[in-house]
């Protein structure tokens, strides 16, 4: 029989793993943005500054989901508030 604490720890590990899958989406999105940015600079070299600025802003916004997922995963693994409720 599984006790409550073991069940919470197992569910937390699964949840942390699922949260880290969000990092895949952020990486794919940043890859597409960098590719399209390089393509745009190749087509319009005069607008390089504006294109790079917009691309970096978009990459920063896309990265926030990965950072939030990492924070949630670390909280679930190392500072789990649910264990104290048992």
Swiss-Prot record:
- Membrane topology, as annotated: Multi-pass membrane protein
Q: Which UniProt keywords apply?
A: ATP synthesis, Cell membrane, CF(0), Hydrogen ion transport, Ion transport, Lipid-binding, Membrane, Transmembrane, Transmembrane helix, Transport
Compartment list: Cell membrane
Q: Which chain positions carry the site (Reversibly protonated during proton transport)?
A: 63
Q: Which InterPro entries match?
A: ATP_synth_csu_bac/chlpt, ATP_synth_F0_csu, ATP_synth_F0_csu_DDCD_BS, ATPase_proteolipid_c-like_dom, F/V-ATP_Csub_sf
Keyword Transferase, does the record have it?
A: no
Q: What residue stretch is flagged as signal peptide?
A: none
Per its UniProt record, what Gene3D superfamilies does this chain match? lithium bound rotor ring of v- atpase
User: What is its quaternary makeup?
Assistant: F-type ATPases have 2 components, F(1) - the catalytic core - and F(0) - the membrane proton channel. F(1) has five subunits: alpha(3), beta(3), gamma(1), delta(1), epsilon(1). F(0) has three main subunits: a(1), b(2) and c(10-14). The alpha and beta chains form an alternating ring which encloses part of the gamma chain. F(1) is attached to F(0) by a central stalk formed by the gamma and epsilon chains, while a peripheral stalk is formed by the delta and b chains.
Q: What is this protein called?
A: ATP synthase subunit c
Instruction: Give the classification, highest ranks.
Output: Bacteria, Bacillati, Bacillota, Clostridia, Natranaerobiales
């Amino acid at each position: 029989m599984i006790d409550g604490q073991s069940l919470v720890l197992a569910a937390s590990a699964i949840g942390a793993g699922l949260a880290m899958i969000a990092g895949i989406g952020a990486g794919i999105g940043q890859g597409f943005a960098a590719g399209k940015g390089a393509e745009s600079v190749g087509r319009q070299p005069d607008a390089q500054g504006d294109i790079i600025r917009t691309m970096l802003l978009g990459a920063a916004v896309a990265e926030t989901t990965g950072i939030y997922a990492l924070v949630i995963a670390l909280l679930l693994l190392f500072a789990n508030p649910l264990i104290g409720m048992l």
